[in-house]
């Protein structure tokens, strides 16, 4: 496959324009085309190229430099573009099942063009669509057809004005009326209004509404999803009893219409209940295929993880763009040098390498992890769709919930910090809006809070781990999970006896070193958190109080260390598999080691506190290894960016273009701005209407 491309298949992977980046491209230790083929595969590369080419050649997607669209116009344009994506039909339902990784690939392509477009398409097709598919049954298949024909437009309505992360406190109700075989969807007051719901503001015709299901006799069975029509598809006017509107302008992603809805005794057919987890008979009896409440809860958790798993991919695409812009800039921006006559690229400075290259490694590690986690989610959803009610299926749901709940914070925070570092690493030019880093920062920011506040989600993961340890302590159970993310904990007493014994930088340049340290760290934090929790309870704290007292210094770092270990483990295994071409092993090994050691270095205090590290040498070796790996990857940085960067039209950043003509591109873009050379329309305010100094000063 690689030889075909190297032999001249420039249609798939065309050569880059000659220019200032040539020197770095020539120094790369590997072929960027070979790495692209290994990472993506030829079929996926062709799929992405089809999408990018369609967008670039379609006038509807034309870039408008300097255009300041009104909120209304941006929303309209984003909807028209979303509709056009359906007209292109890049990914059929059949293709989704055949090649599931094309789903996040499509979302990444759209998100690289505009996060608002990706969010709008994702919320309708995948979040709304997968909720109906995985939580519904055969009676809901007609909705699936309408979703992908865009005959209806959907949204996912869980959050309320006064409650988001605390889903148990959601107050929307669904009372069943056996006389009419209908559910009555009701918002008791404005605080129970569904709020922040993407697509609900102006366009959604249907919503998956989460409400407390109650049957006659005041028996309530917790939150269940219902498909509820909120607007007439023919007029987009609200349905009777539904008050629906837009919440207004946001900090970013303003092409997406986030909205609210209140329901005043809205009657929907009994069949509106998405009944995979539980159903109500015509007479009003609640039934569930899950006899064990814990199994039902585990399965439902997994079905709700699709949004969080998608956000991991959305966050990473923003980091890909930011890193591509900053590293191409750094390779062409020359400042200072060993002599006054010779300036060198800022990428040659160890400080710039240390600031940016760990985020490049993070892109590769987290991107691989997000794909693998998506495939895990696909396995779960296929089990749900086939009616698998096994204990393994429920446990898979709980494990994916734990991984998604921690990987969303990790990915969104890493991207948040990475974009800011990229912005600053580009100096003043990074602050110029046309170079896109500010837009990326604002568009990524909601990833930190929607689908669950990051810090709250981390508690979900730490609770999962604490529950496993409690089960082991009280029942002698082994640590086992379907995806094997916790299996290493079975050996935790022996792991805790280990120490960091690497004494040289050379011996530290392997992700296996960080893997061993991470396993110790997770075992240590799990033990310490468990002991702290029990100590707080013995001191009189309730379970609620005890968990909150443990979270800051114990539970939070436990959850982050666990998910970082999982990311490092999966990427380490990926880059060390036998199928890796020999010519790529060195660069992939360095990326894996850099991400692992850089991530681990942020836990140095805990490693010392627990006794895994001792003396100055351990910390110095770790720090020196990170710097050494940055230096080793410096000459490969531009080629590594070439693998992940979209075409210039999509990247849309003058300082990040593939030709490396930094100043030519930036100067040209500045001169193309609207009215850039015209005097201000309010020029008479200076030239004619002079101020009368002191005329407004108080006479008292």
Swiss-Prot record:
Compartments where located: Peroxisome
GO terms under biological process: fatty acid beta-oxidation using acyl-CoA oxidase
Modified residues (Phosphothreonine): 281
CDD domains found in the cross-reference section: AXO
Known EC number: 1.3.3.6
Keyword line: Acetylation, FAD, Fatty acid metabolism, Flavoprotein, Lipid metabolism, Oxidoreductase, Peroxisome, Phosphoprotein
Example GO molecular function: pristanoyl-CoA oxidase activity
GO cellular component: cytosol; membrane; peroxisomal matrix; peroxisome
Domain of life: Eukaryota
Named cofactor requirement(s): FAD
Pathway assigned in UniProt: Lipid metabolism; peroxisomal fatty acid beta-oxidation
Pfam families: ACOX, ACOX_C_alpha1, Acyl-CoA_dh_M
Positions where N-acetylalanine occurs in the chain: 2
Gene3D superfamilies named among the record's database cross-references: Butyryl-CoA Dehydrogenase, subunit A, domain 2 (2.40.110.10), Butyryl-CoA Dehydrogenase, subunit A, domain 3 (1.20.140.10)
Enzyme class at the top of the EC tree: oxidoreductase
Motif stretch (Microbody targeting signal): 698-700
Catalyzed reactions per annotation: a 2,3-saturated acyl-CoA + O2 = a (2E)-enoyl-CoA + H2O2; (2S)-pristanoyl-CoA + O2 = (2E)-pristenoyl-CoA + H2O2; tetracosanoyl-CoA + O2 = (2E)-tetracosenoyl-CoA + H2O2; hexadecanoyl-CoA + O2 = (2E)-hexadecenoyl-CoA + H2O2
Function, as annotated: Oxidizes the CoA-esters of 2-methyl-branched fatty acids.
PANTHER family: ELECTRON TRANSPORT OXIDOREDUCTASE (PTHR10909), PEROXISOMAL ACYL-COENZYME A OXIDASE 3 (PTHR10909:SF390)
Family recorded in the similarity comment: Belongs to the acyl-CoA oxidase family.
Protein name (record): Peroxisomal acyl-coenzyme A oxidase 3
Species name: Homo sapiens (Human)
Organism ancestry: Eukaryota, Metazoa, Chordata, Craniata, Vertebrata
